[in-house]
Amino acid sequence: MITRNPKIDGSATTVQSLLREMKKSDPQEYRVEGRIQVPDWRGVNNHFQGIAPINGEASITGDISASADRAWVANFLQGTSSPSEVQGVWSTQNYDHAGGIQRLGELLVVPLESDNGATVAFLQGSSYLYEIHQPDGHKASAAAITNYTDSAGVEQALLMVYRYDPKSFDIFRAPADSVSSNTWVRVGGSSEISGREQYQCFALVTQTSTAGVEDTVYLVGLREDEKVVLFSLVTLGSFFGSLAELEQYQFDGSQWRYGVGLQIVSSTSIRIFGCSEDPSGDRDDYHFPLYVWG
């Protein structure tokens, strides 16, 4: 299993520059069609939440999660011609909310909620691999994941699981080559995020260093008001887990309440994916739009 994401080449550009220079209106629109049956999505409280495009790809391919009475995730694939098609669906009746999602190579992390309990499931495609559990009362509303080179030159995988109250993260780490099975260790928590705005999804993006060994890791927050918030993250020393807001960027052209996510296309390119509505049609014959900035 591939467990690596592309890293932004710090000698050529920066995460901050890529977000700052990205066109933030008039996104390209794509269509996704599905004929694999999904759980019922109808109802005022049911909606898409997170989008996890496959990183290192230019095609409209990846996963979308549903916050519904029965949590589910659909895998979509763009073939030689548009539109993209749903190729697989994973669901569980034990959880009622699939939150914000991100991929690490072929590994997809899916936060799931039920009452005050929370679990993070790990999938490969639509196949379940394993899960980890959050402390009691800590709802897992989004999860972000990346790989980075630490100060000792070791490639690590980093997982951040978001909870609403307080607005902060549990942080887990594992050797990057071992996360096809559960080797995660909780290594701490983050500082709190200020403000009342609702985040739909988060993404971790790694930038290579131009001086020294250790990579720089950024957290990108994607809010339902179509605003992107960039945070720096401390991954070393006594301030490990500290977040500092760097910039905010206003986007428009979709409704991120119905799903949003980030894609690392290459070492010099990132894109934002958004949705604007629930699926149209029947449970076994449906379609929905995707909007792409970048």
Model region roles, listed by residue range:
Residues 2-42, 52-92, 122, 126:
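Beta-propeller domains
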Residues 47, 74-113:
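Blade-loop segments of beta-propeller domains
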Residues 66-75, 116-122, 156-157, 165-175, ...:
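Structural motif
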Residues 55, 60-64, 105, 111-114, ...:
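Recurrent small/Gly-Pro-centered beta-turn motifs in extracellular repeat architectures
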Residues 28-42, 81-92, 127-135, 182-193, ...:
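A short beta-strand motif characteristic of beta-propeller blades
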Residues 42-52, 91-102, 135-151, 194-209, ...:
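Repeated scaffold domains used in trafficking and secretory/extracellular systems
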Residues 55-57, 105-107, 154-157, 213-217, ...:
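Short coil/turn segments that connect the beta-strands within blades of beta-propeller domains
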Residues 190-257:
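Intrinsically disordered, low-complexity segments enriched in Gly and acidic/Ser/Thr residues
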